[in-house]
Amino acid sequence: MNLFSALSLDTLVLLAIILVLLYRYGTCTHGLFKKQGIPGPKPLPFLGTVLNYYKGLWKFDMECYEKYGKTWGLFDGQIPLFVITDPETIKNVLVKECFSVFTNRQDFFPVGIMSKSISLAKDEEWKRYRALLSPTFTSGNLKEMFPVIEQYGDILVKYLRQEAEKGKPVAVKDVLGAYSMDVIISTTFGVNIDSLNNPEDPFVENAKKVLRFDYFDPLSLSVALFPFLTPIYEMLNICMFPKDSIEFFKKFVDRMTENRLDSKQKHRVDFIYLMMEAYNKSKDKDSHKALSEIEITAQSIIFIFAGYETTSSILSFTVYSLATHPDIQKKLQEEIDEALPNKAPPTYDTVMAMEYLDMVLNETLRLYPITNRLQRVCKKDVEINGIYIPKGSTVIIPSYVLHHDPQHWPEPEEFQPERFSKENKGSIDPYVYLPFGNGPRNCIGMRFALMNMKLALIKVLQNFSFQPCKETQIPLKLSRELLLQPVKPIVLKVVPRDAVITGA
């Protein structure tokens, strides 16, 4: 009996020691912000502050900004997140100290071959990709892609006309998402698809599988809580991206590169062709060695991942904003009609020269920054503007907060394209307007994305006006998704411009 009691006591002591050690491990970094006097929500052991993300990143960040001010601290598990909103500090992180300290993005999950993509690559590997890929987005290459994108604009118009003739309202994200998917796949892989009418196309199915992501997926959450698991997952070939879809695109890239290397014929310009050509045009062939087929596959998939959701969502938010502001919609249509009389086909130069279209799109990007946040990992201990940031920490720049701050934007919740007029845009601080980031690691595909969206808007607004209907949610409520989305799908009435326009 005494032995049993002794063993029980030893067991209890051992359990107590284990629990104390676990608690200390799960909270070992949680005193960092308190030491510096940086406010923030109280973290939980192991979890940190991640449970607050259930509110939606944009909403949680707004609550923190209102409660704590310009700088606050969060924890993804045990990883400290320094959230900054001061423009000068943001400039230091994104530009001045980009190469020396804040080069890389945060690892959210094991990514497999996608670590070879420009968005997820690190340090010298990222610099090499950037040097090789930047020339693919020149205005000359975009002009060559323009007719390909325009043909999908025509398909979009044809589909919307059919829907308008039925007299039924349209779920715009479904339609504009199909347009975005067609453009991304066609300009990346040189393949013509029609996902509006062929949603079971294997390219479409595999692309959509790649796009599925949930921060609270057990795999993502386990990495947030226990970062040391990432290399273990990588060794075990466990990846957030579906293996069958990765293999589908890899096989296609392999076939494509073989065919093009064997053929002497001139090929249609697409991103895979341009990536193959990038090495031949590189001035520094020693450091900028050619992209391997794995690397080309990774870039191709990241183009889909980065381009589809952002383009379709921004276009959806834009037509919603136009439908709920008919005076702005009319003014934009007048600019389009003046530049392109009698529904003349647009040209690259005409599209990029439209000032009011640019203003409307910029204001949509301000109101609805799809990614909510920018983030950079600190590579070494550093002090910026009085804030000590230790190696391994992450700096968060809350784009949504900056874009909705009344200190920078009077009446920030109002849709006012005039903010970006010639007279006004010079007064905008470039570090409080960050739809595509800033600095050397900004969005490499920004010019392509803007051209794509502008062309789609011109095509549809030449032919239609958008109106609210009884299914339209006004005001628009945003969901808790990781990427900015409405709670309910945006549904609008599409009215051909040669028809009589009536009230909703």
Swiss-Prot record:
UniProt catalytic activity: an organic molecule + reduced [NADPH--hemoprotein reductase] + O2 = an alcohol + oxidized [NADPH--hemoprotein reductase] + H2O + H(+)
Pfam families: p450
Protein's UniProt name: Cytochrome P450 3A16
Topological category with respect to the lipid bilayer: Peripheral membrane protein
Cofactor: heme
Enzyme Commission number(s): 1.14.14.1
Keyword field: Endoplasmic reticulum, Heme, Iron, Membrane, Metal-binding, Microsome, Monooxygenase, Oxidoreductase
GO cellular component, one term: endoplasmic reticulum membrane
Main location group: endoplasmic reticulum
Subcellular location(s) per record: Endoplasmic reticulum membrane; Microsome membrane
Presence of keyword Chloroplast: no
Organism (species): Mus musculus
InterPro entries, A to Z: Cyt_P450, Cyt_P450_CS, Cyt_P450_E_CYP3A, Cyt_P450_E_grp-II, Cyt_P450_sf, Cytochrome_P450_3A
Annotated family: Belongs to the cytochrome P450 family.
Positions with a binding annotation for heme: 443
UniProt keyword Oxidoreductase present: yes
Primary role: Cytochromes P450 are a group of heme-thiolate monooxygenases. In liver microsomes, this enzyme is involved in an NADPH-dependent electron transport pathway. It oxidizes a variety of structurally unrelated compounds, including steroids, fatty acids, and xenobiotics.
GO molecular function, one term: oxidoreductase activity, acting on paired donors, with incorporation or reduction of molecular oxygen, reduced flavin or flavoprotein as one donor, and incorporation of one atom of oxygen
Induction: P450 can be induced to high levels in liver and other tissues by various foreign compounds, including drugs, pesticides, and carcinogens.
